[in-house]
């Protein structure tokens, strides 16, 4: 019953550990997240996610809704970690040196959750992701790193468009 996922549930350390375990698991993370969304679990556990489900992005860079774009970002990060792809050898090497991959995945999930709220979506998402990471019981250092990654994610977008203008796989 989705109604059981309330503030008490979301603040329970057992469920926080289970969510982090999902992020670190060997299984197809984007498929798991999509299934959670389909069942309403993701929106119940991360209420901010509910606000972007089906939300169109009206710009030159995005062709997917915010939620679908988010799943593609997570999928691409996961594939970059698991498989060395031609042209992305350095990225594959670097992502595999990240000691806490869940930090990157959480930043990926939250990077656009501030859209549609008015104001700078990066700043809104940074605050939201910081609160979420703290709720999960993550250290202050990890929570602040997630928040910083969300706040600065447009730098990587600018870099990507400058260096890989034909790569529209997540937009």
Predicted ranges, named:
Residues 103-136, 142-150, 154:
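Extended, hydrophobic alpha-helical segments in both membrane/secreted and soluble proteins
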Residues 48, 158-159:
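Short acidic, glycine/serine/threonine-rich loops at helix termini
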Residues 39, 80, 135, 153-156:
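Conserved, well-folded catalytic cores of nucleic-acid-processing
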Residues 160-166:
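Conserved small/polar residues in nucleotide/adenosyl-binding loops
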Residues 4-121:
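Acidic/His-rich, divalent-metal-binding segments that scaffold phosphate/diphosphate chemistry
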Residues 2, 49-55, 145-154:
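A glycine-rich phosphate-binding loop feature that marks nucleotide/adenosyl-phosphate handling sites
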């Amino acid at each position: 019953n989705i109604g059981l996922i309330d503030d008490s549930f979301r603040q329970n350390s057992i469920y926080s550990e289970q969510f982090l375990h999902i992020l670190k698991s060997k299984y197809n993370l984007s498929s798991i997240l999509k299934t959670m969304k389909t069942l309403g679990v993701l929106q119940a556990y991360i209420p901010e996610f509910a606000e972007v489900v089906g939300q169109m992005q009206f710009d030159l860079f995005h062709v997917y809704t915010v939620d679908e774009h988010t799943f593609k970002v997570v999928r691409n990060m996961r594939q970059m970690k698991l498989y060395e792809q031609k042209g992305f050898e350095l990225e594959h090497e670097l992502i595999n040196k990240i000691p806490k991959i869940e930090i990157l995945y959480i930043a990926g999930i939250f990077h656009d959750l501030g859209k549609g709220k008015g104001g700078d979506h990066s700043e809104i998402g940074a605050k939201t992701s910081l609160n979420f990471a703290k709720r999960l019981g993550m250290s202050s250092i990890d929570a602040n790193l997630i928040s910083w990654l969300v706040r600065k994610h447009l730098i990587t977008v600018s870099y990507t468009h400058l260096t890989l203008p034909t790569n529209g796989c997540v937009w």
